Amino acid sequence: LTLVTMTMQDHATLKEIKDLAKNITLQYGTPDLCIEAMRKKNLKTMIFISQLKAKTNFQVVGLTMKCYSPLCKNASRMDQNLRAPVPMTWAFMMREAGFPAVRSIYELPLSDDVLDEVREEMRSLGSYIALNLEGSSQERTFSLSIAENLIAKIQSETDIPIVIVYGPKGEDKARALVDCYNNVYRLSLSPSIKRSAAIIKDAYIAITPDTSILHMASAYNTPVVAIYADYKTRWPAMADVSESVVVGQKIDNISLDEFAKALKSVLARI
C-alpha cells in the first residue's frame, strides 16, 4: 500500500495544483482511492480531483459529481443534513467503504523530540492548565482585558499553574500576561502547532475558544472547557471530561460566572 498525503495552500495557483496531480500520477500511477477531506466546495479542489483521475473518490460534503463514489451519499447526508461531528462522519464513511471499523476520534501523533523539548520546560510546573486565548478570527480571540479576567477567575478557583498557548500573533499578549501575573507561564521556544499540541497533550485541563486546539484536546483526551462564539455541532468537544460555554458572535461577551461554573465542573470530574 502506498499512501500519499499532502497539503495545498490556499494561495496555490491552478497550474501548481494541476502539476501536483500530474506528478502524483507520473510517480505512482493512477491512484486507487482519493480521500478528499476538505470542508469547502471550491474550484481548486475540483480541478485537483479531475486532474488526478483516481479510480474512486471519497468526500462527505455533499458533492454530487459522477467522479465521487455512490458510497459517499449517506456520509454526506450525515454531514450536510444531520450536521454530525466530522470524525463520526468519516468513521462511518470508511466503514461504508469496507475498511475495518475505526473509532470516531481525532489523532495527532507527535515526535519524541517535540514532546521532550516541551516537557523539559514544563516539568518543573507539575500539573498545569493550558489556556489558549486565540481563535481563527478577531471575533473569536479574547482581548487582553478579558484574558486578564479569565486568569483572575481561574486563579480564584484553583492554584494550578497556567500555561498560555499561543500562535505567532499572540506572543505579545502572552508575554504581557506572564509579566503581570504570578503562576502564569509560556513556552520560551518559538510557537508552533506541534509544540502547542505537546502542551495540550500533557495539560491537566485545556481552555480554548479555538476548534483546532479543541481537536488536540479531543485527540489526547485532555479535559477541556470549550468556549464557542458560535456553536457548531460538527466540532464538539470529544474528550471524556468536557464542558462547553456558548457565548454568541463575539467571544469577549463571555459570562465569567458561566465560565467559572464550567471550570468547576471539569475540575470536580477529573
Show which residues each predicted segment covers.
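Catalytic machinery of carbohydrate-active enzymes
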Residues: 1-270
